[in-house]
Amino acid sequence: MSLFPDSNNSDCRSLFEDTKKSLYELAKNLEISSISNSFFTEIVIPLTSFFNSLEKRDHPYFICFTGGQGSGKTTLSEFVQLALQVGCKKRSVGFSIDDIYKTPEERESLAKSIHPLCKVRGVPGTHDVKLGLDILNSLVHAQASTLTLIPSFSKPLDRHYPKETWREYKGKPDFIFFDAWCGGARPVSTENWKPPMNTLEKEEDPNGIWSKWSNSELAGDYQILFEKFDLLLMIKVPNMEHVYESRWLQEQTLAKTLKDPEMKKKIMNKQEVFRFVMHYERLTRYILEEMPSFADIVVERDKVFNFSFLKTP
């Protein structure tokens, strides 16, 4: 594997000059007003340069960006994809674990047969992993004329947008990026299993039926998908409390970007966001403890959105 580049080397400086205008335009489109130059020069560009230096091969590299809700994984992925396209002339496509949720009807069925909390999207067991594998398989084996549909999910509506509005990707990419809050996660081991750890679990899942079901689901088809990653990048945030605040900030940002009044009504308030994140807390805490030891790249993010590399290849 190639050596990870120094952000000050000539290749990185040249790559930034070639992509700077496009990167700042994307930041504006994403409603990110306070992005720093150093985020691009010290994080996005070295990552882009590293991915571009990987050995050429016939099938795409499959790269996962993982991190808690609101950690910035989707945004970082979008910037890297853009820099690869503009600065390196590489073809890339990205999709998210949020794009492959099971339908509300499927989750309602799980809620009736297993536990009421199963109807809430997010935890392992609420995704259509087969759909994710089908997308990956189509992209990996694509011919020049192959069209791969990339699903799109509406968080305010809690269901997929109509299929006719899904993105079409033509041909085979050089890179496939997948962002997932639990990407690469391993099931919580028996010895690390803890009793109910927040209000939601204490009040609605005191016997651990739902949390153990989700952990069992994670041990299944999710691992088949995760084993296909060529590289796993983790964004490590300071603590679980930071995840709560970051997800609330994400909801506020979403509210600013929505134009449809009916969609705006679906935006969660702070109390609703915090309750929502409680569904993820058990596995998120385990990921924060365990994943830095086996992720290929670890990017640390502090409380004021400063990023730095903690681990590189």
Set out the residue ranges of the language-model regions:
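Conserved NTP phosphate-binding and transfer environment spanning the P-loop NTPase/kinase superfamily
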Residues: 2-17, 40, 182-313
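Switch II (G3) loop of P-loop NTPases
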Residues: 176-182
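Extreme N-terminal, non-catalytic leader segments
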Residues: 1-64, 68
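Loop/turn-to-beta-strand initiation segments
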Residues: 145-146, 172-176, 231
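Conserved lysine of the Walker
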Residues: 73
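Post-Walker A helix-loop "phosphate-sensing" segment adjacent to the P-loop in P-loop NTPases
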Residues: 82-93
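Conserved nucleotide-sensing/catalytic segment adjacent to the nucleotide-binding pocket
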Residues: 35, 93-96, 100-158
